[in-house]
Amino acid sequence: MSTESGPGTRLRNLPVMGDGLETSQMSTTQAQAQPQPANAASTNPPPPETSNPNKPKRQTNQLQYLLRVVLKTLWKHQFAWPFQQPVDAVKLNLPDYYKIIKTPMDMGTIKKRLENNYYWNAQECIQDFNTMFTNCYIYNKPGDDIVLMAEALEKLFLQKINELPTEETEIMIVQAKGRGRGRKETGAAKPGVSTVPNTTQASTSPQTQTPQQNPPPPVQATTHPFPAVTPDLIAQPPVMTMVPPQPLQTPSPVPPQPPPPPAPVPQPVQSHPPIIATTPQPVKTKKGVKRKADTTTPTTIDPIHEPPSLAPEPKTAKLGPRRESSRPVKPPKKDVPDSQQHPGPEKSSKISEQLKCCSGILKEMFAKKHAAYAWPFYKPVDVEALGLHDYCDIIKHPMDMSTIKSKLESREYRDAQEFGADVRLMFSNCYKYNPPDHEVVAMARKLQDVFEMRFAKMPDEPEEPVVTVSSPAVPPPTKVVAPPSSSDSSSDSSSDSDSSTDDSEEERAQRLAELQEQLKAVHEQLAALSQPQQNKPKKKEKDKKEKKKEKHKKKEEVEENKKSKTKELPPKKTKKNNSSNSNVSKKEPVPTKTKPPPTYESEEEDKCKPMSYEEKRQLSLDINKLPGEKLGRVVHIIQSREPSLKNSNPDEIEIDFETLKPSTLRELERYVTSCLRKKRKPQAEKVDVIAGSSKMKGFSSSESESTSESSSSDSEDSETEMAPKSKKKGHTGRDQKKHHHHHHPQMQPAPAPVPQQPPPPPQQPPPPPPPQQQQQQPPPPPPPPSMPQQTAPAMKSSPPPFITAQVPVLEPQLPGSVFDPIGHFTQPILHLPQPELPPHLPQPPEHSTPPHLNQHAVVSPPALHNALPQQPSRPSNRAAALPPKPTRPPAVSPALAQPPLLPQPPMAQPPQVLLEDEEPPAPPLTSMQMQLYLQQLQKVQPPTPLLPSVKVQSQPPPPLPPPPHPSVQQQQLQPQPPPPPPPQPQPPPQQQHQPPPRPVHLPSMPFSAHIQQPPPPPGQQPTHPPPGQQPPPPQPAKPQQVIQHHPSPRHHKSDPYSAGHLREAPSPLMIHSPQMPQFQSLTHQSPPQQNVQPKKQVKGRAEPQPPGPVMGQGQGCPPASPAAVPMLSQELRPPSVVQPQPLVVVKEEKIHSPIIRSEPFSTSLRPEPPKHPENIKAPVHLPQRPEMKPVDIGRPVIRPPEQSAPPPGAPDKDKQKQEPKTPVAPKKDLKIKNMGSWASLVQKHPTTPSSTAKSSSDSFEHFRRAAREKEEREKALKAQAEHAEKEKERLRQERMRSREDEDALEQARRAHEEARRRQEQQQQQQQQRQEQQQQQQQAAAVAAASAPQAQSSQPQSMLDQQRELARKREQERRRREAMAATIDMNFQSDLLSIFEENLF
């Protein structure tokens, strides 16, 4: 009674009850726990009896489950405290409680009855629970807190009862005496008193044993009065034999329950029998140990979760040794009771948080929800029963969950790593022994997913693998013994888990809280990653031979351990890169080209700068482009680097770029770009494997990613996935680009002063080829190029460093001359101003130094092409287009690099002629384009991509002045020279005559080549220095720049623009607007030449003109100088090696833009260009609406720049033409050119050479007309073919109709003839029939003949008038259809758009 009052007082004090509800709560508590009859106004009735010596005792598997699972779970519930002891009506001041409640009941009484084997069957126990809840509902009001608490408990109770074993089987009771003794020891003199202590003990024991499953129930407070019992319970797992725990646990054998550990006392009892059936005390000890697992001894499934100890008790003697070995501490495996008692104290000592989590993980693996696929791993493999005679030979270290549980409870694991190693060893054994498609392997994968998910949530990141196989030696013996009895192993595992949980109550409470948090996290993860299993299985299958522990440790911990190593390694690698890149490498550390150590996170994180939103967006788009077979590697990269996603399902992984580490994003970027490069490389690298491949990679990456992202990703990708290739290609391609720049500056250190001198320009003709050769040569200097490999942003920001590193001397010139040759070659792209001024200065030196190179370039166009494509990769936006040019000869690379723009649709129609003409020249273009690409890359690489493009365009304008024309021609020749060395010699003289123009033409060639300016910067810089030449080129350059800059979206298109060869469909617009402006400028400078060229181009438009015009106009070289124009026209007609390059440009454009195909070339070549600068932007875009969209975007952008920076664009351009002081003006022109380059070009051309403008416009119109006619013809032919087919079908139908009509007529005739002359009619009918048949056959033949002739007249008139009428009808129908079909609205709209464009 006193004890009861104590609990009652606690109840009042507990905060769970509301203030106003204390009485009701107390009453509820009393009602629930009412052990005493309703005697109590002043005194409480005696509690219900918990034992009856006269009543036979009985233990069943269901009762065991009720004790170990149901009662244990309810006892630990936070609302259980009011029901843990009989209602104390005196303390709670409930005088009427026992009057209303005649059969009081509480969980404390139920627990004692279960422990004392009081119930005969489970129904009696369930009835007591129902009585307890009913009493609460009867006595208390519906809304009271105590009622709500009872409802919550009842709900949980019903859930657990649903899992009750279906069949009730009796279990031997070996512990009756022990239990009685235990009670006596505990001193249960009074039933009431004994009930309270039992309750407290039970509550404490469950807390200690199963802290993980449930939070410590409030009952713990009540249980404190019996601290002596709690220590016993804590010690119980090991010391289960101890008497004090036994009294509490004596009744526990009845309920076995694996899932909830709340009923620790009963479980120990059950677990004991399996371990030691002979000795009652040992059984008790084991009860405490195996609370959970022993619950379902009778059922096979239950034993898996929690093997029932009571049911196997008879078998326990056999299994005892094995079980004991698994359960007890290593030393006393067989002496379970004693050894467990001793280990008990050890276990009572604090277990590390990680090991506590391990115990929780193991319990979850034993849970019923996983039983469907976990059951094969519950017990050691029974080699004899399964007939697996070779198992022990293959599997040297068997392992199973029961063995792991016993080792965990016996404290054999020093840390979580050993535990994880054994679990993974168990799975790896399964994967090793069984075939991959075996169902057991699938089950192991599922279970391992559960394990890994929980193991990853370990509090202190204990996942660091400590590949420790300490357990294997022990597990094999246990396994060998274990196979005989499954129930024993299950019971052992349950007892082990219970014992592992047995610690001080405080530890339990902490554990429970932690475990709940972990469970929540795990559930959230499971929900998010619905299928993480497949990923793990794949890894495990791969590493079947390797132990799971080792593998995971390597993956998880090795990464962390290697992080420090990687920090050290990256410097070494960077050193290598620096050595390879020399000057450039220093800047690359930021991109961190950690090719070998992509796996090292710390290193990469240190080096990898975070991705911008644009980069992440581009990366997402690129990942979506990858083929299915490449996505597995993406998932692997993410999972290997992101601990939170390690257990995610690879098939349904969800990637949030915001949560991924920078190193992971960069690694993904490298991989994706490398994959995309591989797709495009085959074509791009056909010409130049080393340089081309890296540049193509860069190009593809730039296409897919922003400029900065593409460059960084390129470097990273080459480093990570293609360490060798990245070194070669990265250095050769990217680095070659920069190296070429560097080498050019170095080659041009002397030319640097020349930039402003006109003489250097004459020398420039040779330099363009040398740039190409230099590009070829740069591959050898890839070491320095590693720096260029840096991201495009790095390139932009680091151009000065590159310049300084490569040509310190040249750098000074840069400041002085606005652009130093070094700047151009090294990072001319970085400095927009450089391209304008220094392009001219450096170009002469380059050309002068590389005249030989020019010849070499001709010889080695493929290598140059490779270099060029690589260069484009750097100036992610503009260089990308250029790379396609070099690749273009292969025809594959263009598709790879530029297909994104709009190349594909246009390629369909006009490209045929262009391709025919241009493809042969493609190789020459490659050499020229190599040079141009290097230059363009350099220019494009300048700090701002837009500026680089402007530079390119600004330089192309220089051709506008007459002096530039020769230079332009020379440049064209130079590009051509690669195929024919003789043409190169010609360009040099022209350049000499007009040094500034030549540089200008080089820029325009870059323009056509899409930014040959980078080459012109070295070679052109001298050209720009000539004031007369430079001002005009900037204007043409403006359109190009505009296009190129705006093309940032059409990144690649802009390149095609500048270099029509670039195989980019967008080129049509580009050709018209950029090339046209340049051409116009050229035309103005040399009207006769332009006129000649446009005419020639018009004549040879189909073949030479496309290439030539594109080259000439796009580059501005041919039109630029009078000599150049004739050269272009001549070369265009005979797609000579020199011409091929221009042809390539045109080809690209034509192919890409169907509408512009025929006309764009002529337009670009003709005086129309002036119109195109402004008008063509829209008109050209209109024809190529799909393809031109990028161009349209670019052009609008171009116009604003022109307006903003070049409002004085026209005057500036004119000034540039007149003044050689383009160094400073070009910068302004860069923007102005973008804005008013087209307008200024249009104005310039009309102002300077009106005759040329007219001639060009005339030729352009002719070209348009020819193109229109050609298109109309093609459409007409198509329509005719379609009509013919339709007519054939009609004829067939008509034949059928005519036959029917004839039959009807024949019948009518027959009737009339029969009336007149039956005989004659019959004869006539026969004849008619024969005739009709013949006629039908004839008609069919005629129809067949006429069907092919869709538009031809209908078959000859039929004998029948009706037939003739029908045929006439059909003919009319056909005519109508033919007329309707001839009118193609799409075709008409295209024609109108072309016409409107021409009007401008």
From Swiss-Prot:
Crosslink site: Glycyl lysine isopeptide (Lys-Gly) (interchain with G-Cter in SUMO2): K99, K586, K646, K695, K1053, K1147, K1233
Family label: Belongs to the BET family.
Region C-terminal (CTD) region: start-end pairs: 1050-1400
Organism in which the protein naturally occurs: Mus musculus
Start-end of Basic and acidic residues biased regions: 321-337, 555-571, 606-616, 1211-1232, 1259-1320, 1361-1377
GO MF terms, alphabetically ordered: chromatin binding; DNA binding; GTP-dependent protein kinase activity; lysine-acetylated histone binding; p53 binding; RNA polymerase II C-terminal domain binding; RNA polymerase II CTD heptapeptide repeat kinase activity; transcription coregulator activity
Biased composition (Polar residues): 1075-1084
Organism lineage: Eukaryota, Metazoa, Chordata, Craniata, Vertebrata
Assembly information from the UniProt record: Binds acetylated histone H4. Interacts with p53/TP53; the interaction is direct. Interacts (via CTD region) with CDK9 and CCNT1, acting as an associated component of P-TEFb complex. Interacts with RELA (when acetylated at 'Lys-310'). Interacts (via NET domain) with NSD3, CHD4, BICRA and ATAD5. The interaction with BICRA bridges BRD4 to the GBAF complex. Interacts (via NET domain) with JMJD6 (via JmjC and N-terminal domains); the interaction is stronger in presence of ssRNA and recruits JMJD6 on distal enhancers. Interacts with NSD3. Interacts with NIPBL.
UniProt effect for mutating Y139A: No effect on acetylated histone binding
Gene: Brd4
The protein's name in its UniProt record: Bromodomain-containing protein 4
